[in-house]
Amino acid sequence: MLIPCWDSAGQIHHLEGFPTSFKDWSRGEELSAQRREFLSAVEKVTPSSISSTRDLAVDMNLTLEVTLDDGQVLVVRQCYPSQNDDVEELWRTSKFESEVNLMQWLEQNSRIPVPSIHSVMRRGTDSPAHFIIMSKLPGQVLMNSHSLLSSLAKVFALSHLTVRNTVLELFRLDVPQRIGTTIPSNPGDGLDVRPKIGKQYSLSADRVFDTLEEYMRHLFSLKRKSKSIGDGDTDKARAYSTLTTLEDLVNVHLKSLTSPSLRRCVLMHDDLHDANILVDIHGNITGVLDWEFHSIQPAVLAVGYPAWLSYDDTNDPRFASSSVWWVVGRQESIELRRQYAMIVKVKDLEYYEALVAGLFLRSVVNWLIDEHADPGCLRLRGWMISEEALGESLTQPDQIVPAK
């Protein structure tokens, strides 16, 4: 399916959207020994045999849509085992267990449309890998559907995302007031906190953080160790200088965030992009997927504009990696962001205040966790220079200044 995408010059192209399937299989067709072993393990916990599969995702996890002989359609998500790396295996297992627990907790404690988990299997005698079997939710991924929605439906999708389904409910759920990734509480049916699981095991935290200041110091430390800043002495020296300047600015900014409502810890989906949201033709949000990366963070970091509307920081066309594309044009993104800000301002003033107050800090975090190559932090430095010129407009969501 071709969808409109914009390049850094603002030119529109029609590119392949998120695949509806990477590979289809039906009974009678050839299977690898590894896939045959895995499907046999799945069939041990399904009510009937598997007649066909579709590979929905194949990168960090294997996600299959399976059709059974009795007509049921389910989703199976396999956690790939690590290849002889105990540290990576612990990371993979930890995010699998955390995702399972959080999805079950959200189904019991919220109205957020997460898939219902039918079965959980761990690697062992009966299974070659950890996997879960879930219900299949209706709808299409927003990445493929957004351009097909009417202007009214796009605004309705923002309203539905905030008010009825995800964002504002996450903002108000009762969660522990420490910074990290969730684990089951013991005893009880609540949540506890473990060190934050990163999108790569090398980016995970080694402890739980009590304050926003501690967490920001951790992120700066990770960036200084990141391969993205370059390997040479010159690149590292330039990067360290830029990061020190930015950290000094952040420390000053943190002193202005005095309201307890801005520092209250909030549950957030760390990967809430347009391929992890399902919508119908009217803009109703029908599913929120892929909770393996989530965290509890201060409100100023946990809130934000929808990721697919971003032309900021690492998505600013002047400084973005060459691999970045945009699924919404700049002018439309400005209008939809304005609508989003208006919606949350009416529905939850504290959310809106965190949205405004945290705009600069969230941009900094996006740069610190970005793993695209940036030797010497030259892209980051260019953004810092441009942001200084914007002045007070950094914190005004209704006055978004487009890039020149």
Curated annotation (Swiss-Prot):
Top-level taxonomic group: Eukaryota
Originating species: Ampulloclitocybe clavipes (Club foot)
Record's function text: Part of the gene cluster that mediates the biosynthesis of clavilactone A, a meroterpenoid that features a unique benzo-fused ten-membered carbocyclic ring unit with an alpha,beta-epoxy-gamma-lactone moiety, forming an intriguing 10/5/3 tricyclic nested skeleton. ClaR, ClaS and ClaT are sufficient to produce clavilactone A and the function of claY, if any, has still to be identified. The biosynthesis begins with the prenyltransferase claS that transfers geranyl pyrophosphate (GPP) to hydroquinone to produces geranylhydroquinon.
Protein's UniProt name: Clavilactone A biosynthesis cluster protein Y
